[in-house]
Amino acid sequence: MVTIKDVARVAGVSASTVSRALSGRIPVEESTREKVLEAAKKLNYQPNALAKGLKEGRTGTIGLIVPNICNPVFPLVSRGVEDTARKFGYTVILCNTDEDVNIEREYIQKLRKKWVDGIILATSGKESGHITELTESGLPVVLLIRRLEDRVDAVAVDNNEAARQAVAYLIRTGHRKIVMVNGDQGLTLYRERFQGYLRGLRESGILFDPSLALEIPEVQNCYETVREFLAARPAPDAVFAASDPMALQVMRAVKDAGYRVPDDISVIGFDDLESAPFLDPPLTTVRQPLYQMGAAAAERIISQIEGKASTPEERAPLVRVMETELIVRQSTRDRTD
């Protein structure tokens, strides 16, 4: 392995001069710099990024932990993180936890040992003790999509308000019996979406019927659960699904039960994934700015890493709430006609 001393020997200068010439931050005579660069090229010298990072106090790497890379939400978010990090000269290490909080803890410890400059975390679990420990360690941390507490920097959407607007739209277009197909209530975002569903009903004077609220922790069980629900009782007017992957299974279950979307049952999702306009029928859904959320998380973590916050207000935990939008397509209809 070629070292900085080898470059110094070939260039006829000291190792410290090679270090200054290659860093580009400390003035070095141009002729000396050219000799160093020529020697480095000749020897195919690659600087030791870790050693350089330890010396400077940074490694130029950011850890990104996501709960399920197969969930179509997270590739879009990850792309936003990576594209933005690259613009600022950072490399992203991606870790997938499979929705397992123990794997999440393990990755956090491994990333800390690898001297990453900060961690962006879309948490997989309901526990927050290890996240509190992480933030108290002093390592920059930003929570993404799934936030826990306002005392940790986070980028998310107002799930409560977005869900309320979706339900209000259904009610405004003549739907009264509205089923909610929700995820694991142990996760903040699903609790918030459920609260928005309840608020939408309450504000319209519709009494909440607990039998219309389906909690389905595993998205792959959505189809069977909805089929069983439809087989056991009269059809609802609409189904509000807490995610687009759930909405896709809801639509298939509705059709296989002999109903039509939206003629018999309207369906609304939450995400606006790239596939949503191409479903049959195209899916009405709440749009989350997923790529932009990833980009915002990267910008915030880099701001922490580079110490750009100079005032107490700027250093205080920041929860950035991104705007959502209800995208109306053909999976819902107006029942007031």
Q: Which residues fall in each region the model found?
A:
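Short beta-strand elements in bilobed, periplasmic/extracellular small-molecule ligand-binding domains
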Residues: A85-N96, M180, L198-Q220
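Amphipathic helical "hinge" segments at domain boundaries
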Residues: Y45-G118, Q195-L198
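Hydrophobic alpha-helical segments within soluble ligand-binding/sensing domains
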Residues: V155-M180, E192-R199, V219-R227, A247, ...
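Short, solvent-exposed amphipathic alpha-helices that sit
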Residues: K35, V73-K87, A162-A166, T188-L207, ...
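Flexible loop/turn connectors
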Residues: Y223, R227-D337
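N-terminal helix-turn-helix DNA-binding module of bacterial transcription factors
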Residues: M1-G60, L76
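Flexible loop/hinge segments that line or gate small-molecule binding clefts
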Residues: E99, L121-Q165, G186, P245, ...
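An alpha-beta-alpha
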Residues: A166-I206, S211, E313-S331
